[in-house]
């Protein structure tokens, strides 16, 4: 066992804190680098290995960049509002504020034991009034700019969590938090108008240095469709409904239309003798999730309303049905059905014996869903689909029955929640003045402490009279506060803006400061936030830019997703499975640098993998070996015998490894390929070990090599490297050293070994001068005794030379 351990960790953590080593210089922003890891939910009592995998390696990357001369800003905070913290409090019987602050205290100690460069002076805690005052201010800015509104709508309701969920929080028809089946409920809720930014959110994705899969997920979620909105009038009525379609070329093939069960028009057009059946069908639809309703494998159900609509292109009557596969939350809540050219419509028509009329030529069987030539389409016959679409819409535009339109799958962001542990929405309701925004000078609207927050479907704040009853800011009369709280994603949609100006009591942030430090240069976190936090933060940034507060378009210039650390059994860690890994236990045994280095060496950073105790033990043995090797190097440096000043073959060999390590580690660390960085350090250790066992050594040269080695290992083992740097006699931090540059000349060996093949099979390896010309290489290869066995008496067809690697002799 070496000397490295938690005692050395603590020693250097104290020194770093006392010396303010990682100070971010706000007066020198030319080479600023804002490095940010997604902050934690303090809903559990401890950080786990997954948190470490996010924070540790990314801190190593930040250290590496600091040593390259960047002025690094790396803050940390806690996403402390929301369901996870509230559910934890309900489970333990401790008030959310008390349990949250206790958990934050524990997690802060754990994060500090990591030895990361976090700027704790810039900490934010989203559940503190000093922070959520400005979350409420953000709400008011959106409200003033018509980007926040309240409406009655069918919403996703989790009966277990007893709260509304945004569309993004429903996974396969279930609550992302508790996996309960989500149902639909009509409620009056607050929304943010993210759809106003749909096009820009889509367009700007291509400019971002983000994982392609994440960009694809956002593109799919935004879901742009270019088509037309067409109007179908109800027969014998002044009522009508609009549909959106990308296939106006198939309009002559419409044989029926379908409305969503929730569409308000259903009640107005349903004939008396169909009402009972329609009502029963609507009730049944309420029990189905949107995912279930849209499943391609599920049988398509529906009920006829008794009414007919007029196909706008040919004046034909088509029956109007109600079907639960149509959603009121997407498009217009109504669809035209073309069974000959749509699989879903075809299945529905077959089941209900509805007409099927082919209007696009192509395919041997129906439905034919590709483009083709229009047929049975009157004056449009013979047109190719793309031209036909334009021609049909042009005709309908002249008759005010259609218009070209772009549709998006993206829905407005539902932000109100019927839970306690969140930022109160700064709105009051007055009988005289209506809906009134709380004046900015009255912020924050504080969350009361003494509230019964056990979920029962009602907003907990509605039970707190002292909170609910207030005075109208406009007329001074009695009023009632909004009792819903904001979705926790509202808090995290702007936290990256607050860090750099977190003590500002007059503003959410000073635009002058933020516009110099932002955007975030490197953001690190899990891919599970692709369609929620990452999308919402982009929306907030663009909205604040348009209000004049920001001068940049995107919050995160570069994004990296860390992989997932699994339990030793290869399964996702969970307490119920008993396969969780507690960093504290391993740090106590091995030290935080060994834990950090194992995470970087044992896994591809973007992929992760299964935890292995043997893996961390092997890294511990490597650190011990480095310690012994450096001790031997120091001994010779301080006590040289038979010392020399020349650079001979042994020195050249070590110098090659030294500069090859500098080159490789620099390139790989930049790309966050940490496992190969550690592998190069292992090779460098072997080279140092080999050199100190030579008879004659150059102590001055050896010291230079040791210095570079310690600098190279420093980002990956910060405490250990500081200790080794000090033992080498240095009186300043290794992190104040500049990152070394490789010497390309040192990477050119005087002699190299190359393989010699005969007809593609290796027959010998020869050592040649690195600059040897091709004719001399051929001659040396042909003179090899091992090669002659396979070439003598044969015709040499050609000799292929791949410089520095091999010679291939082709014979017959």
Curated annotation (Swiss-Prot):
What EC number(s) are associated with this protein in UniProt?
6.1.1.4
Pfam families per UniProt: Anticodon_1, tRNA-synt_1, tRNA-synt_1_2, tRNA-synt_1g
Arranged from A to Z, the UniProt key words for this protein are: Aminoacyl-tRNA synthetase, ATP-binding, Cytoplasm, Ligase, Nucleotide-binding, Protein biosynthesis
Q: Which SUPFAM superfamilies match?
A: Anticodon-binding domain of a subclass of class I aminoacyl-tRNA synthetases, Nucleotidylyl transferase, ValRS/IleRS/LeuRS editing domain
- Ranges spanned by the short sequence motif 'KMSKS' region, renumbered to the chain: 572-576
Cellular compartments per GO CC: cytosol
Presence of the UniProt keyword Acyltransferase in the record: no
The short sequence motif called 'HIGH' region sits at: 40-51
Which GO MF terms does the UniProt record name? aminoacyl-tRNA deacylase activity; ATP binding; leucine-tRNA ligase activity
- Which Gene3D superfamilies would you find in this protein's record? 3.10.20.590, HUPs (3.40.50.620), Isoleucyl-tRNA Synthetase, Domain 1 (1.10.730.10)
Q: Is Ligase there in the keyword field? A: yes
Q: Where in the cell is it found?
A: Cytoplasm
List the catalysed reactions. tRNA(Leu) + L-leucine + ATP = L-leucyl-tRNA(Leu) + AMP + diphosphate
Give the matching NCBIfam families. leuS_bact
**Protein family:** Belongs to the class-I aminoacyl-tRNA synthetase family.
Q: What is this protein called?
A: Leucine--tRNA ligase
């Amino acid at each position: 066992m070496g000397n490295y351990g938690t005692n050395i960790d603590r020693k250097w953590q104290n020194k770093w804190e006392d010396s303010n080593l990682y100070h971010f210089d706000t007066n020198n922003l030319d080479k600023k680098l804002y490095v940010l890891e997604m902050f934690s939910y303090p809903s559990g009592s401890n950080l786990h290995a997954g948190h470490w995998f996010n924070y540790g390696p990314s801190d190593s990357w930040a250290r590496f960049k600091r040593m390259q001369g960047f002025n690094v800003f790396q803050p940390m905070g806690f996403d402390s509002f929301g369901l996870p913290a509230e559910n934890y409090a309900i489970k333990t019987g401790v008030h959310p504020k008390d349990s949250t602050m206790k958990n934050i205290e524990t997690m802060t100690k754990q994060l500090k034991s990591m030895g990361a460069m976090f700027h704790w002076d810039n900490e934010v805690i989203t559940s503190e009034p000093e922070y959520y005052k400005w979350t409420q201010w953000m709400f008011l800015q959106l409200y003033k700019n018509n980007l926040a509104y309240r409406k009655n709508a069918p919403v996703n309701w989790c009966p277990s969590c007893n709260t509304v969920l945004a569309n993004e929080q429903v996974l396969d028809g279930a609550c992302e938090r508790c996996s309960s089946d989500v149902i639909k409920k009509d409620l009056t809720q607050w929304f943010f108008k993210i759809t106003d930014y749909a096009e820009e959110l889509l367009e700007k994705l291509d400019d971002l240095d983000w994982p392609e899969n994440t960009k694809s997920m956002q593109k799919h979620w935004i879901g742009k469709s270019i088509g037309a909105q067409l109007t179908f009038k109800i027969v014998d009525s002044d009522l009508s409904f609009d549909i959106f379609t990308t296939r106006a070329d198939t309009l002559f093939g419409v044989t029926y239309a379908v409305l969503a069960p929730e569409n308000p028009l259903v009640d107005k057009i349903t004939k008396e003798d169909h009402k009972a059946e329609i009502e029963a069908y609507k009730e049944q639809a309420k029990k189905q999730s949107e995912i279930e309703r849209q499943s391609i494998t599920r049988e398509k159900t529906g009920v006829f309303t008794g009414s007919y609509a007029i196909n706008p292109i040919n004046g034909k009557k088509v029956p109007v049905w109600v079907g639960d596969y149509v959603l009121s939350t997407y498009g217009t809540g109504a669809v035209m059905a073309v069974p000959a050219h749509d699989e879903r419509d075809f299945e529905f028509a077959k089941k209900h014996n509805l007409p099927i009329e082919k209007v696009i030529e192509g395919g041997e069987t129906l439905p034919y869903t590709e483009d083709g030539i229009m047929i049975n389409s009157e004056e449009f016959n013979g047109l190719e689909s793309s031209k036909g679409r334009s021609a049909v819409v042009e005709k309908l535009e002249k008759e005010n029955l259609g218009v070209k339109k772009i549709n998006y799958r993206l829905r407005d962001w539902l932000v109100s929640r019927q839970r306690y542990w969140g930022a109160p929405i700064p709105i009051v309701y007055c009988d005289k003045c209506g809906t009134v925004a709380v004046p900015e000078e009255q912020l924050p609207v504080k969350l009361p402490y003494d509230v019964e927050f056990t979920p029962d479907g009602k907003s907990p704040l509605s039970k707190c009279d002292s909170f609910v009853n207030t005075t109208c800011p406009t007329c001074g009369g009695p009023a009632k506060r909004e009792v819903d709280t904001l979705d926790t994603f509202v808090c995290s949609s702007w936290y990256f803006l607050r860090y750099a100006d977190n003590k500002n009591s007059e503003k959410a942030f000073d635009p002058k400061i933020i516009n110099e430090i932002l955007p975030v240069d490197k953001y690190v976190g899990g891919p599970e936030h692709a369609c929620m936090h990452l999308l919402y933060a982009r929306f907030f940034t663009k909205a604040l830019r348009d209000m004049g507060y920001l001068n940049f378009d995107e919050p995160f210039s570069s994004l990296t997703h860390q992989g997932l650390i699994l339990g030793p059994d290869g399964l996702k860690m969970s307490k119920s499975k008993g396969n969780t890994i507690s960093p504290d236990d391993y740090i106590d045994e091995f030290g935080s640098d060994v834990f950090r280095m194992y995470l970087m060496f044992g896994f591809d950073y973007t992929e992760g993998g299964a935890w292995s105790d043997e893996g961390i033990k092997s890294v511990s043995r490597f650190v011990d070996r480095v310690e012994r090797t450096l001790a031997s190097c120091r001994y010779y440096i301080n006590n040289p015998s038979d010392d020399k000043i020349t650079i001979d073959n042994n020195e050249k060999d070590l110098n090659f490894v030294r500069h090859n390590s500098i080159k490789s580690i620099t390139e790989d660390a930049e790309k966050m390929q940490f496992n190969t960085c550690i592998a190069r350090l292992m090779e460098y250790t072997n080279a140092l070990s080999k050199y100190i066992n030579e008879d004659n050594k150059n102590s001055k040269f050896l010291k230079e090599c040791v210095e570079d080695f310690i600098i190279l290992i420093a980002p990956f083992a910060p405490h250990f490297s500081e200790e080794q740097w000090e033992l080498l006699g240095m009186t300043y931090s290794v992190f104040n050293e500049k990152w070394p540059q490789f010497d390309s000349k040192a990477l050119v060996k005087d002699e190299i070994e190359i393989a010699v093949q005969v007809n593609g099979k290796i027959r010998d390896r020869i050592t040649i001068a690195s600059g040897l010309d091709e004719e001399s290489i051929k001659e040396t290869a042909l003179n090899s005794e091992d090669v002659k066995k396979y070439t003598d008496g044969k015709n040499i067809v050609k000799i292929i030379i791949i410089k520095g690697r091999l010679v291939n002799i082709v014979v017959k």
